[in-house]
């Protein structure tokens, strides 16, 4: 998998006037959308740090890792500019290019810890591990508070002088989510027009971060500036 592969997909769909929607599924989770809207509306001030933890036997960089990186970039609302990364033990010689079996066997694709610099000055941290019981937790820290969200629960903490006020968000009512939400959006776009929640260029940005993390791991965890050259 290379950026050139992604570019060919984007060009082909644009040339043929075809919708390309990428299944980064949390874009169709109503509770996660509500949290993102609150951040956009300034509920916690300016986002300065995003922390995502995902532990699972399937914490593979090019499987669930794609969703994790998409999530932090989405919530940060900013483009990545540099990446530092450290792979799990046993992958010291992995990289600088994708070399797994396409997301099937976990021993071919590393879990990764990475720090992503963003062009608004914020930082995003993604930490994944295959040997810890399943945990999925996202925290967004802003200048006036924080949002914490997992699969089906979310809290917002804001400052009031020296006091911290925490409240749990109600779960929105919905008729479709996950992949079904993605498909419902596609049908609506075909009928009425518009742009997908996750188009090819958005997904390409995620791929670039993943590939940069492999280059960082291969270069002794060095800082890799974007855009990268993965030819």
Spell out what each predicted region is:
Residues 48-123, 127-133, 201:
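Rossmann-like dinucleotide-binding domain that binds NAD(P)(H)
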Residues 9, 35, 212-213:
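Aromatic/hydrophobic pocket-lining residues that form π-stacking "cages" and hydrophobic walls in ligand
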Residues 16, 30-49:
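Rossmann-like NAD(P)H-binding beta-loop-alpha module
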Residues 104-109, 119-184, 199, 228:
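NAD(P)-dinucleotide binding in Rossmann-like oxidoreductases
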Residues 11-16, 37-41, 66-69, 99-101:
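Short, hinge-like loop/turn segments at secondary-structure boundaries
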Residues 14, 40-43, 77, 191, ...:
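Residue-level signal for alpha-helix termini/capping positions
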